[in-house]
C-alpha cells in the first residue's frame, strides 16, 4: 500500500500543474536572488573605500530584498504557492501541505533558480565577484545558525499567517483575491527587508538556503554553508509546528483562523 501511494505521488510530480509549479519556483527564486545579490553588488560598486561603514548599502540591500521577495511571491502565488525558499517548502512538507516528492522537486527548482541568477550576475557584473552570505567575525557558527533559525522562524510563521492559500484559488472575486495575495506578499517582503536591516551585518540575514547556495556555487566559497542550511531548516520546522498548534481548533479550542 505504501509503495502504491509513493508511485501515485511520483506520478503527480510529473503532471502538467506540477511542472508549471516547478517552473514558477525557478523563475520566482531567480527573480529574488538576482535582486538580492545584484543589489549587494551594486551597493558595493557604488561605495567608496572611505565610507564602507555607512549604513547606506545595508539599507539599499534591505529595500531591494523587500520588493524583490514581494514580486517573487506574487508572481508565483497562484501557480506554486510562491515558496521561493527551501525553508518554506520544508515547513509546508512538515505541515502536510505538500508531499515529500513534490518538495524535493521544489527544492531543486529553487536551488537551480538561485544558481542561474548568480551565474547571470557573474556574467554582467563588470568583474565584481558574486558576494556570499557570511557571518560576522565576532560571531560563532553556532551563534549564526541560531540567529538564522530565529529569523527564519519569524519569517516562515509570517508566511503561514498571511499566505496560507492553495495555488489556483477555487473561484470567488478575482480582484479581491489578488488584492489579498498582494497584501500577503507585501507583508512577507517587508518582513524580509526588516530582518536584513536588523541582522544583515551579523549573518547577512539570509533566511533562505537557496539565497546562500547560489552565490556559494558561483563563487566557489562554501564556508559556513551549514549555518545557512541548519538554522533556517530548524527554524522553519518549528514555525510549522507552532502554526499548527496555534491554528488547529482541536488543540487550541475554538480559534477562528483568518486564511488569505
UniProtKB/Swiss-Prot annotation:
Chain positions of motif NPA 2:
208-210
GO CC terms of this entry: membrane; vacuolar membrane
SUPFAM superfamilies reported in the protein's UniProt record: Aquaporin-like
Highest taxon of source: Eukaryota
Transmembrane ranges? Answer: 23-43, 57-77, 98-118, 135-155, 182-202, 226-246
Q: Which GO terms describe its biological process?
A: water transport
Q: According to its UniProt record, where is this protein located?
A: Vacuole membrane
Q: What is its main location?
A: membrane
Keyword set includes Transmembrane helix: yes
The record ties this protein, via Pfam families, to: MIP
Q: How does it sit in the membrane?
A: Multi-pass membrane protein
Gene Ontology molecular-function annotations: water channel activity
Domain comment, as recorded: Aquaporins contain two tandem repeats each containing three membrane-spanning domains and a pore-forming loop with the signature motif Asn-Pro-Ala (NPA).
Q: What does this protein do?
A: Aquaporins facilitate the transport of water and small neutral solutes across cell membranes.
Q: What is this protein called?
A: Aquaporin TIP5-1
**Organism, scientific name:** Zea mays
Q: What is the lineage of its organism?
A: Eukaryota, Viridiplantae, Streptophyta, Embryophyta, Tracheophyta
